[in-house]
Amino acid sequence: MQIGQRLGTPLSPSATRVMLLGAGELGKEVIIALQRLGVEVVAVDRYPDAPGHQVAHRAHVIDMTDAAALRAIVEAERPHLIVPEIEAIATDALAAIEAAGLAEVIPTARATQLTMNREGIRRLAAEELGLPTSPYAFADSFEAFSAAIAKIGMPCVVKPVMSSSGKGQSVVKTEADVKPAWDYAMAGGRVNHGRVIVEGFIDFDYEITQLTVRAIDPATDATRTYFCEPVGHVQVAGDYVESWQPQPMSAVALEKSREIAHKVTEALGGRGMFGVELFVNGDDVWFSEVSPRPHDTGLVTLASQRQSEFELHARAILGLPVDPALGTPAASAVIYGGLDERGIAFEGVREALAVPGADLRLFGKPESFAKRRMGVALATGATVDEARERAKRAAAAVRPVSAR
């Protein structure tokens, strides 16, 4: 099937089939975008009733780090495209699936392997591409970890080589922080337990996500790199709590950001959305991380852009034209669960939606935790500052409560 020139009808022999590996809130939005284009979507996650499961044509629950289980589900469903939405996947199995011609992996199996942990992508960015990064060292024992901190110096940031949403991440400021940071990283890592990255602290003015799309240029039929306007964000313990678009920045810094994003995404190859995280201080820019998929800070694009990052991803992977233009200043603010319970309810929705320019996305996660992201408030405004104030006001109005 020549995807992009021809799309089929779901649940029929002509169907264009896409399998998402990871069906959280970001995957859910990708599924909705794909279904609007008539794509048949299969959602896979490690737990039942995940947000994406609730909107997909079919849902499966497997351990995605189990190569045999992953291969079996692909052989059973026979998707045309496999779209990883999380890091905790048996990427060697994806490479074998792609090599066997069973399905195309988005953006590529190699990109998925490189970005599944911080070591692969940091070595690509710093050592192969020569991009500016913070000083760093890797360690797989407490002794090596202590030596890495001595080499990098304090303060420094410690992260498991494989984790997401800030899990296992901490800042080491004094000797008293060293052992707790190691223990926290060991508890927070996914799959590759026992290995961490120690990063030197960068004194930055702000952080951005440069959403970067590799998609077909309809004028040339070749792959082209497109950029969204920069997304500013606030993170607490490595977890996004607020984002806005556009982030004001100098023309020099913007150009450097896009040069870095272009180099790293071109090296990864394939088609789709990439979230390139960068530190900015004045006109200086440092590469931090890249995800070969929509980014959580990019949830703001549901309000700010004509085509959200999820629609851009869907179009790009299907070989369709994209339009990353900004429509209006907008912001997002996270709604946390607030309590540990299954099947919670939300009060204050009416008040939240009464905020001018506001909208909500309640993700439908089956189980809440106090600091689990259960939804997000979105808001537009005449300025970024106005949008941020509205988004935070709407988020604060939503009150997760026990359904008992």
Swiss-Prot record:
Q: In what residue span(s) does the ATP-grasp domain sit? A: 123-318
Q: What class of enzyme is it?
A: ligase
Give one GO term, molecular function aspect.
magnesium ion binding
Positions that bind Mg(2+) = 277, 289
Q: Where does ATP bind?
A: 118, 159, 164-169, 199-202, 207
Q: Part of which pathway?
A: Purine metabolism; IMP biosynthesis via de novo pathway; N(2)-formyl-N(1)-(5-phospho-D-ribosyl)glycinamide from N(1)-(5-phospho-D-ribosyl)glycinamide (formate route): step 1/1
* GO cellular component term of the entry, any: cytosol
**PANTHER family from the xrefs?**
FORMATE-DEPENDENT PHOSPHORIBOSYLGLYCINAMIDE FORMYLTRANSFERASE (PTHR43055:SF1)
Protein name, per record: Formate-dependent phosphoribosylglycinamide formyltransferase
